[in-house]
Amino acid sequence: MIDCRGVSFSYDGVTPALDGIDLNIEDGEFFCILGGNGSGKSTFAKHLNALLQPDAGTVRINGMDASDPELVYDIRSTAGMVFQNPDDQLVATLVEDDVAFGPENLGVPSAQIAQRVREALKGVGLVGFERHETHALSGGQKQRVALAGVLAMEPRVLILDEASSMLDPRGRKGLMKVCRALHDRGMTIVMITHFMEEAAEADRVAVFRAGRVAMLGAPEEILTRADELAQLNLDMPASCCLGRALREKGVPVCAQVREVDMVAEIAQVYAERSGADVAGRPSASDSRVLDHASSAADGMVASEPVIEISHLSHSYSLSARERRRWRKRSTTVGASGKQTLWGNDPNSPWALRDVSLTVRRGEFLGLAGHTGSGKSTLVQHLNGLIRPQEGSVCALGLDLSSKKGAAAVKAKVGVVFQYPERQLFAETVAQDVAFGPRNLGLPQDEVVRRVATSLARVGLDLAAIGDKSPFELSGGQQRRVAFAGVLAMEPEVLVLDEPMAGLDPAARRDFLELIDRLHREGLTVVMVSHSMDDLANCCDRIVVMNEGAVFAEGTPAQVFAHANELKSIGLGVPAAQRMALSLVQAGVPLRCDKLYTVESLADELAGMLLGCADGPLRASRQAGSKMATQEEGC
């Protein structure tokens, strides 16, 4: 289906973005491409539907030469592409018009277009959103509209360029289910991703480095090679990390790339050594969800509130009179209004519904929730970007209902949006970082000091890059400059809306370390994230949003003890916790009141498995340790 031979490409004529790529993707194959930021993945993807032409080499799609201008229309009808950022792809003001755009341009009859639009929206869980305006959707909902628009074209090849990066856990699961169904029907899937769990579902995996194919093979061959992946800024799947940690402790298990296989193997080992039956049993998370009104984070030292939100409601579509009328109606959302695969209520006019919460000085607060749950709307209230319609927001003693308060708070509560590098606009790095302090009317020497200090705080040197255009920098450096521009305002509260979106695992770790350091320096941090692992590792307290309302709050251990409730609203738990709960269901007696990491889970399992029998398992410890030093897989 796709045949690439000696494909090379450069954006500037000097630095190769692709360097002699030889790759063949079979008809009907599920093919995954991994690689660090800047490795050439997206550039390669754009060659597969003739958005870019190679400087050297050939790209053939279903036998068609992608360099032939006469074949571009046919190639783009054959290979549909979903980009990482949906704003780069949406073209219409209404959802149904956007989804219909592709089929209309293919000359599909009107009756068939209507049917395709219905089926595509059903496939991505957006039934009922046909007449919604695309600009009013959340980032994840926009991504699903973009996917529906490509599905409605019925291509033979579906190219996904990190299309899951803005989706919540249920959205990613829904996307994978759609991909598997299309794959089962014979469609060729080319998926670019940073999620190793998605790569584990592919038929084959290629890993890019500096525009070349560094690794190629089945997921079981590629995803278990920890050292090589680390050199490529990638991680093993959590299941492989657990398997490796267990082998290092003497437990002879394989590094399974799929969690379900890892859980089954550990449960089988436990059953063999303990004599217990491997049978399902009730999950430890079947208890009642946290009462968000009374579940303050246990063990946290109380500190003064910096932001207080009381009974906040917001609608993008209702007038004040209509809001009063709606408030008389029940605020509960019936199950019939939800779409079980993706999760939505298309009939609700509320972005926020009666939200009350407090952010305390010095804490690291996480915000979780499905796409469209109101997270971004909520954080835009925290520094006056949106003023309260109903209820109140008080930040650092300022009433944000007033214009004066909303204006004054912007210097004290800094917001970094999704893809913060898109906040850059000035000719030089120094000018961009200086923009905020200058608008505060600060003296020039103070502006210069803040620019240098804020760049240093994010690991950049003013002398080295201050006079450069921010658009000459790498993506990671641009993101750091955007952070510096907010820090130059010297805020007391830093609000981060999905700050790690689109980053490879190594860059993600770097930014998490940066954010953690800023927190330890005294900043109060509020972070929105779809990564349950990031929230578990960083936050003192987590607030969970659902359909515009606070669903639960508590410490990470408290919140993630309720896996079933979180799953019901489109969320999940950290990977290690997910495997631990699956092991409990399989009959392995792990503790249920504990938040596990891969390391702590491996420690507890090793102690249990090595202690439950004196015979074959203990005798195999030496062999298991030896195996751990060899190839990562089995």
List the predicted regions and their residue ranges.
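Conserved ABC ATPase signature
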Residues: 133-137, 141, 469-473, 477
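Conserved catalytic motifs of ABC-family nucleotide-binding domains
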Residues: 154, 490
